[in-house]
Amino acid sequence: MNDRNLKKLAPKSLGREKAQLVLKNAQVINVFSEEILVRDVAVEDGVIVGVGQYQGREEVDLSGKYLCPGFIDAHLHLESTLVAPPELIHSALQWGTTTFIIDPHEVVNVAGEEGLDYMLEQTEGLAANVFLMLPSCVPAVPFEENGGVFSAEKMEPYLANPRVLGLGEVMDYVSVIEAEEGMVKKLRLFRERIKDGHAPYLQDKQLAAYALAGIKTDHECIDYAYALEEVRNGMQVLIREGSGARNLEAIVRGIRDNSMDTGNFSFCTDDKHINDIQREGHISYNIKKSIALGIPPLKAIKMATINTARCYNLTKLGAVAPGYQADFVILDSLEEVAVHAVYHKGKKVDREKKIEIKPCPEQLRRTVHLPNLSADDLKLAVPDSPSSLIQMIEGQITTKHVRDVLPAQDGCFVPNAQYNKVVVVERHKGTGHFAVAPVLGFNLRQGAIATSVSHDSHNVVAIGDNDESILLALQELQRVQGGYTMIRGQRVLATLPLPIMGLISDAGYQAVENTLNQMIGYAHEMGVPAHTHPFIALSFIALPVIPEIRITTRGLYDVVDQEFIR
């Protein structure tokens, strides 16, 4: 705080002058002392000037409602919500999230710097704090076929932007622990800044080498045992509760049962669709679920506020105390995290405010370029002996590498409701590259599903129990320039167009929510397991940095052994 601001604010802090806004008779949650104190909160120029007894030019009597810091999402991909960034921010604000630390690697994988510039522009000037982590692995691994490359040299100009905090999730852990030159350049560039991790199943010395590189966080923990190993290595665990990956319960139960200190834990959503946010909440849901599992309410709130602010060096966020930005949430119920009102920089968020969305450059609406495939192209020769296939795990984005004798005719794989066929097709540069593989555990029958949201290269992925439905699904996504589609037989049941880079809708969130809910219902009717989110599960099947086995445009890839399966 500079001298001029101090001279203006100090008289309000001392109570000699009335503050601009005073929220009176609040039960204030103090994240430093872990107390609930009945106090007034005084605000001037968007800054908290005092917590005590104050008078204001404007006063709001909270009549004993709880007042806590605005919630922070430690890691999310705005694109994964499927709606324009301002739509998502507006929706999540209603649930108390006032700070978003985003990794825009989806749009950068599709459109390079143009995608990053789009995200910066779309999130500028909103009634929330939106910070960016620059994508570290574009493409995710060197052999991936995506739409752009984001090198250390291309990152450097963005470091001057005050909203850029650090380096986004480092997925290519092999490049880190082997100190490969391209990765070393990026780590060196961000030497004094925070670096996010992505480290599923790294063990012992590998995890030590990863942490040695200065990587501070990880959101890929799926159980308490692995979370504990990361904490022991000095890392901050970002507990994820998204649409596809729901890891909170397993980790939080471990924290509770072992009386683990919560200081090295934060909350994130990572990839959470707008329909789930509207139904469950945002970071508020992580807090509520943790409290229900036995975490003391104030510790759960700390995991959503000050823990994250400290981790990311956001020194004026995450607490209700003098000098902190006046971002706070008013709660009717602490245990239920029932949001009554939200304030950002001392101004009440208007839930009814019309959302203004800036136009998208036209070239970002033409990103899907698929070959004209035939049923013959999709044939997959298989032996009479066991073949490698992808086994999906219900409720998780990890997979199992299994071998089985596949149903076949004339030496070619014949998909059915048990053994589906998945196809991934390069869509950025019109190369015509594609690959086919068998899948166990998705259980789709009498149709196909396809998506252009396919982490992280975002090629088009289709899965089904017959070639004709798969081909129709691919054709439909070419027609609408990206999105989700559901096919039953030879009929398009429903399509959710995502014309902005094949990732984002230009319709309002309510239209997206309604269509998505309908399509998920169709998928479960057609056999997809109840706890599998069909589109999230499919969107991760081509990401070759999450164990154990994936499919890329070059074929089946063994993530554990780091090699293609021939």
Curated annotation (Swiss-Prot):
SUPFAM superfamilies, sorted: Composite domain of metallo-dependent hydrolases, Metallo-dependent hydrolases
Pfam families registered for this protein in UniProt: Adenine_deam_C, Amidohydro_1
Entry cofactors: Mn(2+)
PANTHER family cross-referenced by the UniProt entry: ADENINE DEAMINASE (PTHR11113:SF2), N-ACETYLGLUCOSAMINE-6-PHOSPHATE DEACETYLASE (PTHR11113)
One GO biological process term: adenine catabolic process
CDD domains associated with the record: AdeC
Gene, per the UniProt record: ade
InterPro entries reported in the protein's UniProt record: Adenine_deam, Adenine_deam_C, Amidohydro-rel, Metal-dep_hydrolase_composite, Metal_Hydrolase
The protein, known as: Adenine deaminase
EC number in record: 3.5.4.2
Organism superkingdom: Bacteria
Catalytic activity annotation: adenine + H2O + H(+) = hypoxanthine + NH4(+)
Keywords of this entry: Hydrolase, Manganese
Molecular function in Gene Ontology: adenine deaminase activity
Keyword Manganese: yes
Sequence similarity: Belongs to the metallo-dependent hydrolases superfamily. Adenine deaminase family.
Statement: the UniProt record of this protein carries the keyword Manganese: yes
Enzyme class: hydrolase
NCBIfam families referenced in this protein's UniProt entry, alphabetically: ade
